[in-house]
Amino acid sequence: MNTQVQAKKSVQPMTGPEKIIAKACGLPSVAPGDFVFPIPNMVMVHDNVLPSIKKALDSIGIDQLTSPEKVVLVTDHEVLYGSPRAALYGATNRQAAKAWNVGHFFDVGRGGHGHIFPMEMGLVSPGNFVFDNDRHCTNVGAIGAVGFRVGLEISRVLATGTNWIMVPHSLLLTLKGRLPPYVHARDLGTHIGRLIKLGEIPFDLDYKILEFAGDLDQFSLAARVALCSTPTELGAYGVFFPPSSAVLEHANRVAKSPFMAEYSDPSAHYQMRAEIDLENLEPLVSLPGGIQNAVPISEVAGLSIDHAFIGSCGSSMFEDIAAAAEVLRSRKVSSGVRLFVVPGSEETLKRLAATDLMQVLIDAGAVVLPPGCGPCNDAVVGPLHSGEVSISTATNNNHGRFGAKDAKLYLGNPLTVAASAVAGSIIDPRHL
């Protein structure tokens, strides 16, 4: 069923995200710097903050939400209750979902990662506006939506149906050429961070929307998710891909309600523009302390590892894990290395089980965990002890993210992580 409706011509040149914000506000147009109150299509809250939000609303006598049908409550940060506190949070979250009569509650084993499965299930569509408590809501830019983090002010959205925002400025990054084999969108994301750090792309992403343009048809929804998850670690407030025909086909197939995709006008204003050539890009690894600390993999090849993790809201869709599984096929995880694989959604888990890829992962010695954040949530599962070395597809590698503060956290693409788990040391997947 085609659920897309015809977009209206804007009254002044606007970017796609500006059109989405204007539409959510019921305004003919918006401009950077405007203070507005968008009405979201979806409101997302995850399990780790929901108890404090419920307590805050209870304390001021709010026991009903303005638009409960738009609310999505997700258990993804602590799927495996590793402590009595986690079990208490789970019970509190179930009570909140029932008391508020929310439209969508995805408890343990029901949905997966909140920044992944709503796009797979059609809860978020092109042209939608989303409020979220978590910064990785930038992922919805992969499907052509806009997601803004409001932190604990999500309680105000739940109570009143909206919250103020200042319309951000937009930056346009044009991608030229095609990614070489074994180079993943994650590599491109870290490359962007590296170029910004070096000053070769003079972008200040703080409270900006980063929009992609250029040779974009090569990027699947999974690749777009990988690219949308990275800039938020560099300060971006939003990320946006204009929907491709393939993305629109997916959205039309799964959308739960009519949607209207938005595209930037040719004469739309951007605070700054830049271009990147993709043809000579190679696999990169981010050194501990920040994704922008990226170097060619050759500079760290041979470094022994203890731990590997494939997952997170940046690299946990079926395409990501399938690519890693093919690297692992007929191979074994090196002795002394523990490899965790965390699918991003129940849908991905089912697809892996429906093929031989789940068996490939098991035969290789990987530990497959339930869909969710996995170790990326401050290592509530699979932590590192002092001095251990990890390579993963986590969204960041800040010191202490996976447990011990002196553990060394390296980031790579799913193929690099899988190959390194087999080799027992960081290795270019092209050389395994």
Regions found by a protein language model. Give the residues of each.
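Fe-S-dependent hydro-lyases/dehydratases of central metabolism
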Residues: 1-432
